[in-house]
């Protein structure tokens, strides 16, 4: 983290992407600014985003490989240049992009002699390879070579104890960290009581998502951490008991919606997030699992789409309708609501 003094000031809080580039298929770079911030706020935001970007962003990777009758991971296979351990290390480096949840199966089945690359992996429909040229192994003889793989979406660094599995499968230390590196710096501007801070944030990703997408997901994760405080009343604590301990947010959904109604261009539904709709924790979590993050996402769904969501009930549908009816103009509901 670097702190410098610079001249200049801004009047309204805003963020902006000032630089974005693709260095390679597996290296994306983005540079962002957020300003103006009061003294100390830039450090608070920078530290929180750094932790969220490096530890809370989900990634997809190969977590297990099954070779068949291989005694241990240091074995060599006739007709293959690499050892089993080297193949496992190569599989660990494969960068995948997906929105899957849970474990999925994949496989490789080829005939030599030839080079095996990531392009040879047979994947489920929900998964794609970022760089198909990543090497896996070199078959030097005309042999049939097959591997069964497991793919999982997770976060952080996952390790498993090394042991010989009777079915010939071996765990791969999963690195589910799309953000490869991150740096933030703070610049001070203004004089006297008008002094503000500007936060610069640099993000490098592995290509499975862009720096802008990573920043969005990290921000959403941080918001999710504080949602239980906003839904304290639902957990059995009355508002009367909490009103002296809890200050409602300055910019509530209703106030923001009122401002948006004044916009002649109409309500930007993609700027209203579902956590602003005062939904119950249960309904909110159901929508989040279905990748419904904004009001635009919600209003584009039919009743059938919502009922197909795992654990979604008719009571949730009624709760959503009552909430939207409470906050949105009735003509907007008639025009936009699909259910």
UniProtKB/Swiss-Prot annotation:
Top-level EC class as recorded in UniProt: transferase
Pfam entry (one): RNA_pol_A_bac
Region described as Alpha C-terminal domain (alpha-CTD): 264-339
GO cellular component assignments: chloroplast; DNA-directed RNA polymerase complex; mitochondrion
Subcellular location: Plastid, Chloroplast
Keywords: Chloroplast, DNA-directed RNA polymerase, Nucleotidyltransferase, Plastid, Transcription, Transferase
Function: DNA-dependent RNA polymerase catalyzes the transcription of DNA into RNA using the four ribonucleoside triphosphates as substrates.
Similarity section: Belongs to the RNA polymerase alpha chain family.
Domain remarks: The N-terminal domain is essential for RNAP assembly and basal transcription, whereas the C-terminal domain is involved in interaction with transcriptional regulators and with upstream promoter elements.
Name this polypeptide is given: DNA-directed RNA polymerase subunit alpha
